Amino acid sequence: MIVFRNVTKVYTAGSRALDSVNLQIDDGEFVFLVGPSGSGKSTIIKLLTAELDPTSGSIEVNGYRLETIKKRQIPYMRRTVGVIFQDFRLIENKTVFENVAYGMRIVGASSKEIKARVPYVLDLVGLENRGRRLPHELSGGEQQRVAIARALVNNPAMIVADEPTGNLDPQRSYEIMMLLESINALGTTVMVVTHEQELVNRFTKRVIAINEGKVINDGMDGYYINEET
């Protein structure tokens, strides 16, 4: 569960990125977080992964209260949230298997655990025959699937996908969204951060709209108007 209570974030330059934001995402939900560039979406991601501290307010992430969390607990909290980046952030000289396994190695998983878990996750995302490939040998859609597998490998409670289809054509975008839906159906909470109007409106999900640092709409109508277009 993610809870923001009256969260405000003001950067050192004085710009107010978030203004008294209240939101709650329950376990097992699928949520779109939408808004134009500069609306505060990226700040929300950085706050819930403890990359930033709020100026005021409180944040709870999967049972961790971030205003009181100890530094040594932050890595454990972050393991409960798998982040998928728009630019994939794959290690170019490592195979698909090694890229996904990396997430397990940094938390101290054994070779036996890695050999059992990584093939399972690659199969889940449809890359069971791509484990020995390097990133440059894959299509954009396949690279995004590797990024999803890496985010999933430590079995997080929640996946945060930051513009996961921004570099993909419409068909590949739809396939990635269907994959995220299937992951959500297995019980993982999914938050997709996007400004793509057509993508959001194609799926009937909860939509949290943010603009100028404020939540301006939160509903299950699955409809979003991107005012930038």
Regions found by a protein language model. Give the residues of each.
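Helix-to-loop junction immediately C-terminal to a conserved catalytic motif
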Residues: T49
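Conserved ABC ATPase signature
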Residues: L134-L138, E142
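Short coil-to-helix segment of the ABC ATPase nucleotide-binding domain corresponding to the Q-loop/switch region
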Residues: K94-A101
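Catalytic Walker B motif of ABC-type/P-loop ATPase nucleotide-binding domains
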Residues: I159-D162
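Conserved ABC transporter NBD signature motif
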Residues: G57-R65
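A short, proline-enriched helix->beta-strand linker immediately N-terminal to the Walker B motif
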Residues: V153-A157
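Helix N-cap at the start of a conserved alpha-helix in ABC-type nucleotide-binding domains
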Residues: P170-R172
